[in-house]
């Protein structure tokens, strides 16, 4: 077992899942450590992501905890063996860790679903739009800090442009479409970009019009990241102080249902493009 000062988001998730397995098996850390032939301190360090864990140890722990879901177990194994130093590591000294965790989880996701009520999806923002958003972050960032955030956001978008892009589905409230971030020129360019991206086969954009009134999750910005198996999905919520990550199965099920409802309420992709085009022409 090895240590590192800043565990990756995926290593943290593996640690969380191993703790969940132990708790479901009804074992204390003392009993589990004894059966594994290790100390309680070492097991606690594994479950808190301070120590890494080998594939063989993951399989042994899963077997000891009577976990028969081999797809899930092997997904955990792959999470420990995949390349851990992604492009986001270059930002570790200049951006909050939560933004790096989001980039890492997105990079390894199989699909992404999002819903936004007051701003454009980060994965579909233009550089000028993102720059204007980050200029209004509190506490006020310096110009270099703004550019670091813009660069990081644009690099996240490689998910959509790479050779094997993810499936991306987003619902954006009409309010976010109409807000003229950066003025008419920047806002119009953002809408044209949104239209262009919506034409891609693997990208679905839907607008939730003002006319729907109240809807589930209003006021929330939600990123739902699909993992290799449903148990390893992640729901991420935007908060003023930074991103919040959720992995409890009951919450994952709730946010999947919420997104289902919002998507079924929103305009079709075709009607969405018509509305975005009309709003763009009025700017």
For each predicted feature, which ranges?
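Key DNA-contact positions within bacterial/archaeal DNA-binding proteins
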Residues: 30, 40-41
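Short glycine/serine/threonine/alanine-rich loop segments
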Residues: 27, 38, 203
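Interdomain hinge/linker segments and adjacent boundary elements that couple functional modules
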Residues: 2-16, 20, 24, 29-34, ...
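Positions in alpha-helical segments
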Residues: 16, 41-44, 257
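C-terminal regulatory/effector modules of DNA-binding transcriptional regulators
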Residues: 164, 171, 183-283
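N-terminal membrane-targeting segments
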Residues: 36, 44-45
